[in-house]
Amino acid sequence: MVHALAAETDETAQAADIVERFLVASMVPDPQTAARYISDELKITFTGGRKYRHPRETAAFNAKRYKWVKKKMERTDIVPAKGETIVYNLGTLYGEWPDGTPFDGNRYVDRFVVRGGKIVQIDVWNDSAERLIAKQVIEA
């Protein structure tokens, strides 16, 4: 079965803009600015099933995993739903591991649920764990 995406509306365009602004603030990282775009009921699930409630928590996790990390946002897909908009942001991560080794081309998919002009849910997937495992195997 093939489903066509609905034409972009003001609501879906606004949801995509909210997500992009959130991601830009998160990459600084500026959790305070990122928090402008989230609901008080925000639920974040990171890779490995890690649960968070606020951008400052994900920034703290990323500070342990990476020396620094940024996103090359390549595509945004918008899926309108009843009472909410689902926004997928896809691309690659680049930056440095804690030991200073650079990396690039690390795929990611972020899924956002936007309701009432706020992000209420974020699901994050990326290849970082796979790359860290491969790096350890190569160095061992």
List each language-model region with its residue ranges.
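Hydrophobic pocket/interface hotspot
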Residues: 22, 33-35, 42, 58, ...
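Beta-strand elements of well-folded, non-transmembrane domains
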Residues: 95-99, 114
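Short, low-complexity N-terminal intrinsically disordered segments enriched in polar/charged residues
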Residues: 1-36, 40, 138-140
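A short hydrophobic beta-strand element
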Residues: 83-93
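A solvent-exposed, acidic/Ser-Thr-rich amphipathic alpha-helical stretch
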Residues: 31-85
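Residue-level structural signal for beta-strand termini and adjacent loop
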Residues: 57, 108, 124-127
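Low-complexity, intrinsically disordered terminal/linker segments enriched in charged
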Residues: 6, 121-140
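Short, surface-exposed coil-to-beta transition loops
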Residues: 71-75, 103-109
